[in-house]
């Protein structure tokens, strides 16, 4: 059960980070409202707070989170940007998820 909670938390964290970066991107590149920076900032604060909820060393969390971030970014590419991922995008994201699983769930000495 801890594994599902960890993965779920990583997924929510990745969405918070991507939203926090995507909204300023819209402002800078597409001339959208400067007011997008407010929810972007709040999303990045949420992102940092969510990372703090993991009960393991920060470096391990950041390393493992990167694998989930890659997976969510590929989903974002497809669902938000409307660009279908290539086979290699999918393979790469699965390799990253496998790496995350090794980092987070490998047996460790007590």
Curated annotation (Swiss-Prot):
It comes from the Bacteria. The chain crosses the membrane at residues 7-27, 33-53, 63-83, 87-107. Its main location: membrane. One of its GO terms (cellular component) is plasma membrane. Keywords: Cell inner membrane, Cell membrane, Membrane, Transmembrane, Transmembrane helix. HAMAP family: UPF0060. This is UPF0060 membrane protein ASA_2267. It comes from Aeromonas salmonicida (strain A449).
């Amino acid at each position: 059960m801890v594994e599902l909670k960890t993965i779920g938390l990583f997924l929510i964290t990745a969405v918070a980070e991507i939203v926090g970066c995507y909204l300023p991107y819209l402002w800078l590149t597409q001339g959208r409202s400067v007011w997008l920076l407010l929810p972007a900032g709040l999303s990045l604060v949420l992102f940092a707070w969510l990372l703090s909820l993991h009960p393991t060393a920060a470096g391990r969390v950041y390393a493992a989170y990167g694998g989930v971030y890659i997976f969510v970014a590929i989903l974002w590419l497809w669902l938000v940007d409307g660009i279908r991922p290539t086979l290699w995008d999918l393979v790469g994201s699965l390799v990253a998820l496998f790496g995350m699983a090794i980092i987070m769930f490998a047996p460790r000495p007590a």
